[in-house]
């Protein structure tokens, strides 16, 4: 098999025209004949490039409002023809070989994302000729290069220059993989969209299926292979969504440290998503996907100091997330005080990075600033299936709370209640969080009974010498019995925030009144499993 194939004729037809003129100029300068269609051909001609319209090349005009442009034997025969095997039939039918196909597809995703997009608009943005050429070229990658990403343009020209105008089989095969990934993702988007239109399309209902289509096709790109998974006997890799806009662990840049492990990524995600909940300078310390210390303050240094005090033992080997730039003082405090696996922040000063560089094993991630949280889907794998739900972006403000007890909370109790309610959302259920003066003082996570989570939170506060008297307590779900309130009162809690909704709410409220506790209902639950 010939490893290198010269590029003498290329067909260019792109929706995203970024970089296409420069790429076409580079090809033309290297003696490559250019074929093109529609808007791409007009653009290249306007730039003075010698380009042949596909309709002139085939002798068959574009028709049906551009629906039929490249679906012709002279095009697909030129792409699919096997060099050295189909030469005679190609010559008989005057089919010239096409050595490179440069195609990206109609912007279907952008079209259906527009408000008010009709089914007719969506249908007209389903590319037919493009995917057909892409698949044809990818199938015949032994002889043809298929280019679907503008990010590959420069590398292709460099390789052609290094190989007297040719591309290697390894490159063509790699480009073919990208091509099949591209068409698979494209067809998945269309299938998901059409699936979401059922049953409205068939008149079975006035409403479309909505957020969850009949079949779910997912497209993720591998970012890295892992040494192992959650445990050393499990193989693992990290896949990310394409074109993610929101700052996340998936989009973050690692500026120092060892490669991230499976557990590092999971824990860093938990820490970052929690710290995003706060507008004030905040620090979140996470261990095994649970916050073990959270605080807000006037500076991230003080926020870190206070978060660390919640549970210094658990903070060892933890993940630390900030919602402000990592500065030198805070970096020094962390490095001097504890062993840390990962630090993630929107940015880091040069001085801070010089300090963390002294501990080369510490992983430092820069994620950039974030704006409004983007809606999306959460997935949970079960044996033989996949549970899918909206991301839990729900949160309540002070004006949405209901005071259900005789006593009203003080201003500080209310602030602490809202603070620990935000934290409880990220603690594994059953979750109980004690907070005072904008810092956690005890966290009870993952217990099978809510009362034991409440007891553990109190024990942790006592172990660290943190005063519980006058604190607020958050529960991620309702109290089924009064025992959780009794345990909180015994520890010194004076305000409780919880969803409400138990058949025994009256008993729970009565217990709060007996202890002089103010109780707030959120009418929103935050289970986390």
Swiss-Prot record:
Reaction it catalyzes: (6R)-10-formyltetrahydrofolate + 5-amino-1-(5-phospho-beta-D-ribosyl)imidazole-4-carboxamide = 5-formamido-1-(5-phospho-D-ribosyl)imidazole-4-carboxamide + (6S)-5,6,7,8-tetrahydrofolate; IMP + H2O = 5-formamido-1-(5-phospho-D-ribosyl)imidazole-4-carboxamide
CDD domains: IMPCH (cd01421)
Residues bearing PTM N6-acetyllysine: 287
InterPro entries: AICAR_Tfase_dup_dom_sf, Cytidine_deaminase-like, MGS-like_dom, MGS-like_dom_sf, PurH-like
Signal sequence, renumbered to the chain: none
Database matches in SMART domains: AICARFT_IMPCHas, MGS
Keyword terms of this UniProt record: Acetylation, Hydrolase, Multifunctional enzyme, Purine biosynthesis, Transferase
Record-level Gene Ontology MF annotations: IMP cyclohydrolase activity; phosphoribosylaminoimidazolecarboxamide formyltransferase activity
Coiled-coil annotated residue ranges, if any: none
EC number: 2.1.2.3, 3.5.4.10
Alphabetized PROSITE patterns for the sequence: MGS (PS51855)
GO terms of biological process kind: 'de novo' IMP biosynthetic process
The protein's annotated pathway: Purine metabolism; IMP biosynthesis via de novo pathway; 5-formamido-1-(5-phospho-D-ribosyl)imidazole-4-carboxamide from 5-amino-1-(5-phospho-D-ribosyl)imidazole-4-carboxamide (10-formyl THF route): step 1/1; Purine metabolism; IMP biosynthesis via de novo pathway; IMP from 5-formamido-1-(5-phospho-D-ribosyl)imidazole-4-carboxamide: step 1/1
Pfam families, alphabetized: AICARFT_IMPCHas, MGS
Cellular component aspect of the GO annotation: cytosol
Residue intervals of the MGS-like domain: 1-148
Annotated family: Belongs to the PurH family.
Family annotation (NCBIfam families): PRK00881.1, purH
Domain comment quoted from the record: The IMP cyclohydrolase activity resides in the N-terminal region.
Protein name: Bifunctional purine biosynthesis protein PurH
Encoding gene (name): purH
